[in-house]
């Protein structure tokens, strides 16, 4: 993209540092007295805080190129032809703004490779679907290899883990704040969502060696 820089429609949308600041503020206030019941989830997220900074720090250091990203790349934001099922266009463009391409690959991986619903109460059903991940990345890389840098390529899998983590942070923050951002259908909905994201990260981590080996072998 060689045109003028787009405006940030939602400033620092995928800024992991800011999201942790929001979590820490929500935790300090604990307006609904919920923190004591989610110690394990909080411990996990804070233990992974430093790793979660890789994309935002990459942008700041310019190791990652800034481009134009959609920032909400889930399959239900693609409009399909009713008769042929062929994709027609991308929709829901209110979050289009500057970012790293890895924001988009990350959200695509997060939403496409989970074997369960985003709000599955039984986290044993939440698994990272490695065969689907492979097919997804092979298809993506066949089109993206011309513009992805080696560093961006090396972080393709990490991007999925990263965006899953930021969603868990945001969901737990909203839970602590009294469910003021995300629509909920029952009082525990946000913490159920967050637990699903954390379970997906743990499933990714269990398979990480083969995941990263696959990424390292792309295009070779």
What are these regions (language model features)?
Residues 62, 76-117:
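Catalytic activation segment of kinase domains across protein kinase-like and atypical kinase folds
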Residues 29, 51-58, 93, 111-114, ...:
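Conserved helix-loop functional segments at active or binding sites
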Residues 1-7, 144-151:
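Surface-exposed helix-capping loop/turn segments at secondary-structure junctions
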Residues 2-70, 75-89, 162, 180-185, ...:
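ATP-dependent phospho-/nucleotidyl transfer catalytic cores
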Residues 148-160:
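All-alpha amphipathic helical-bundle segments outside canonical DNA-binding/catalytic cores
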Residues 45, 136, 155-156:
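A structural signal for short hydrophobic/aromatic patches embedded in well-ordered alpha helices
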Residues 196-220:
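Structural signal for terminal/edge beta-strands and the immediately following C-terminal loop/tail
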